[in-house]
Regions:
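Ampiphathic alpha-helical segments that act as solvent-exposed interaction surfaces
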Residues: 99, 132-155
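Compositionally biased, low-structure terminal segments
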Residues: 46, 68, 126-127, 141-144
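Segments surrounding the PLD/"HKD" phosphodiesterase catalytic module and close analogs
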Residues: 109-137
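A surface-exposed partner-binding patch
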Residues: 1-110, 155-156
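Short, surface-exposed linear patches
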Residues: 67, 89-90, 121-125, 132-134, ...
Length: 156
């Protein structure tokens, strides 16, 4: 089984730049903001997700938003991982040990399962409105690679 890295993600971003709209390291959240978000959520972000935030901030793959960390909810609620997850938990759409990172227009929800957090990582699952959660990726890099390939029409 392949272990995905940030280099794998970077190669796919270069290859499929026409369907990807990510930020850059220059506009990425700093360590203080990331720590504040983690404290507010009561979860430590995975190493792969933190690396993504520091290198790409967040953005979209096709029309699918990848949630990020924003400064003090500056009127940007749609893609803010803290705001979205606190509301999801409050409204019964997620459990405290699930960190939702993306929702598609088709009702798919992708989230980290923190009940399996080990060595700085935990797997991602997805679920549709009508079904049970299904394993999706071993880390955030694999998640990104699979989502990019799916949007590009390449088999994951």
């Amino acid at each position: 089984m392949k272990t995905y890295t940030l280099d794998d993600v970077a190669q796919l971003i270069d290859k499929y730049s026409d369907i990807i709209n990510f930020g850059t390291a220059e506009d990425a959240p700093d360590d203080i903001l990331i720590e504040k978000a983690e404290k507010t959520l009561g979860l430590q972000f995975t190493d792969s997700y933190k690396s993504f935030l520091k290198n790409y901030k967040g953005g979209e793959i096709g029309s699918e938003e990848i949630f990020s960390v924003y400064v003090e909810y500056k009127g940007i609620h749609a893609g803010d991982i803290v705001y979205r997850n606190l509301n999801d938990i409050k409204n019964g759409l997620a459990k405290p040990q699930q960190l939702v990172v993306s929702r598609t227009d088709f009702g798919e929800t992708f989230y980290f399962d923190y009940t399996q957090f080990r060595d700085g990582e935990c797997p991602l699952y997805f679920e549709v409105i009508s079904g049970d959660p299904l394993y999706y990726a071993s880390n955030f890099y694999e998640f990104l690679c699979k989502r990019i390939k799916e949007h590009a029409g390449e088999s994951a």
